[in-house]
Each structure stands twice: as C-alpha cells, then as structure tokens.
Amino acid sequence: MYRKLLAGLLGMFTLVVVNAQEKASYFKKADTFFNTYVSEGRVDYDAIVEHKNELLELLDLAKSIELETFNASDYQAFWINSYNLLVIKSVVENHPLKSPLDKAGFFDKTKHEVGGINITLNDIENKLLRANFPNEPRFHFVLVCAGLGCPPIIDKAYLPETLEMQLEQQTLKALNDPNFIRVNKNKVKISQIFEWYKGDFTKDGSLVDFINKYKSEKLPENSKVSYYAYDWTLNGTK
C-alpha cells in the first residue's frame, strides 16, 4: 500500500516537473519567435512560410501544456500568446491572404489543438479569457487578429512575470495613439472594438471614462463618440 502511494506521489511530482519545464520552454521559444518575425507591429508572414517548422514545433509544444485559472498570470500569458501564434499559423496555412476574413471560418470554425483541447480562436478569446476574467478589458489590446485594425502585435511574448506591466503598457500605447483614438475637438472616433465589446469597457462608467483612465490628454466629458470602420487588411510586413 505504502509503495503504491509513494509511486503515485512520485508520478504526480514528475508530471508537475515536466509540465513546468514544458511551460518554461514554451514561453522562451515564443519570445524568440516573436522577436524574429515581428517588427514595428507587422508580421513577416513570407519568412514564416519559409521557416514554418519553427512555428509548428512551438505550437506542438503548446498542445500538452494545461493550466488552471487560479494561476491567472500563467494562464492568461499562455492563452494570449497561443491566440496570437494560432492567428499567425492560420494566415500561414492559407498564404497568401489579404485579410483573415478571406478565409471562411478563420475565427469561429477552424479548430486548433492547444492546451490539451481542440478550440477555435473565438473560443480562446471569449470562453477562456473574457469569460474567466470578466473584469479584464485589457485583453482587447493584446489579442491580435491579423488585421491592421487591431492594436499592433509586439515583438515579445507575454510572460507571467511581466504580464501586468505588458497589459498596462499596451493599453496605454493604444489609447494614446491618435490613429486609434481620433479626436477632433469634442468629436471622437474610436475603434469598433469598443462597439463590439462595449460591456467590457463600461462596467465602471462610460467609454469616455475608460479611455480617460489611460489617455494623457483627457477627452471632454461631453465628447460625441462614433466608431470608424475596422480595418481587416492583413498586418503583414510592407
């Protein structure tokens, strides 16, 4: 009985160690990948097509990594990176594309094996991230859908130990970008992201309140807000 219990405990310990090693390797390799193929908010899809195995090996590593929501920073960082990597993989698999919308089911039908499950991009965003962390609107500034209308992708992986800083940094960057928040006196044009996910941004006030929380030059309280059309043009290198 004692030997069986000991064997079981050793087995569990081994699984924990292996999972931790795989997780560390995943974040390190993801960081190298983004640093290699992302520059100034653009993705070099042509180069990735030529070296596709790097991406496939990275995502193969992600297949068996399973994380729980109670470890929020690990969980969020893993799924943010995985979303962005799977978007890139989907573009590469359908190369050349002018827009992710050129491929039917890009976000809501195509399933990917990652984190021990088969899941669509929409489900990563809506079920694994937004539903599990309903008070975290900053996801919208780090999940990159391959369209130029998204806040730009960064040349680093999101890491558990730096995630809070990175979320804050990317939100500040987006909301202080005059091309993202377009101000003309008291008329303000904002991304359709704020229209589609309005509830995420207005739990503690109006859209203007949320934007002003991060914007250095505050919007007038009486701002007339409208939405400009989302740009689905592919975010590839020029």
What kind of region is each of these model predictions?
Residues 1-22:
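Bacterial Sec-dependent N-terminal signal peptides
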Residues 22-238:
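Interaction/scaffold regions that mediate signaling and macromolecular assembly across diverse proteins
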